[in-house]
Regions:
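PRPP-associated nucleotide enzymes
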Residues: 1-216
Length: 216
């Protein structure tokens, strides 16, 4: 009897960071599956996988970033569409790989009548059929709790520390605000470097504008 081997690992990428996906595929020794993404004249996105993913372990890679003429929202929606396609194609398990997780800064209500969009995004992924999420250095660890499925929260710290060590011995690690002090402390400890903290406040009613108050 002839044995038929079926491909179990399917690595699929959206368009926001295709070079990264290609490097991952090369490192794993696998080929990127083709989602055949296309845009209609009205901007809607369509995809259809070139190969069967039935019973397979599907990883869908997409950074939620603005690139290649895409907005963050475009990147997110494109990934959701691919997740839905994989689920409807009977994939056994679907893992979304989000090197940069969109809307991560909106992880709480800082004022009344605001959304918690990082939680909303997690809800959308779960509703689409995601079984697991992988991300790198989330804005805050609490985002892991927004998912009802497992989250692998990776860190690029070892890679960055190795690079920083090539910059010299007289280093100072600066935390841009009090919220990142613990992270800065970890880097300073690994590098045996000094630590500085910037105390700042945001200018009310002005987007992306801050005032630096003190450096400690």
């Amino acid at each position: 009897m002839e044995l038929i081997t079926k491909k179990r690992l399917h690595l699929i990428s959206g368009r926001s960071n295709l070079p990264l996906a290609k490097e991952i595929a090369e490192h794993l020794g696998v080929e990127l599956a083709q989602p055949n993404l296309a845009e209609f004249a009205n901007g809607e996105v369509h995809c259809r996988f070139s190969e069967s993913v039935r019973g397979g372990d599907v990883f869908i890679i997409q950074s939620h970033s603005a690139s290649e003429g895409m907005t963050i929202n475009d990147s997110i929606m494109e990934q959701l569409i691919m997740v839905d396609a994989a689920r409807r194609a009977s994939a056994k398990r679907i893992t979304v790989v989000c090197p940069f997780y969109g809307y991560a800064r909106q992880d709480r209500k800082s004022e009344g009548r605001e959304p918690i969009t990082a939680r909303l995004l997690a809800t959308l992924f779960i509703a689409a059929g995601v079984n697991r999420m992988i991300s790198v250095d989330l804005h805050s660890g609490q985002i892991q709790g927004f998912f009802e499925k497992p989250v692998d929260h990776l860190t690029a710290m070892p890679v960055l520390v190795d690079y920083m060590r090539t910059l010299g011995d007289d280093l100072v690690v600066i935390s841009p605000d009090t919220g990142r002090v613990k992270v800065a402390e970890r880097y300073a400890s690994e590098l045996a470097a000094d630590l500085a903290i910037v105390h700042k406040r945001r200018v009310k009613n002005k987007k992306n504008v801050v005032e630096s108050k003190d450096v400690m």
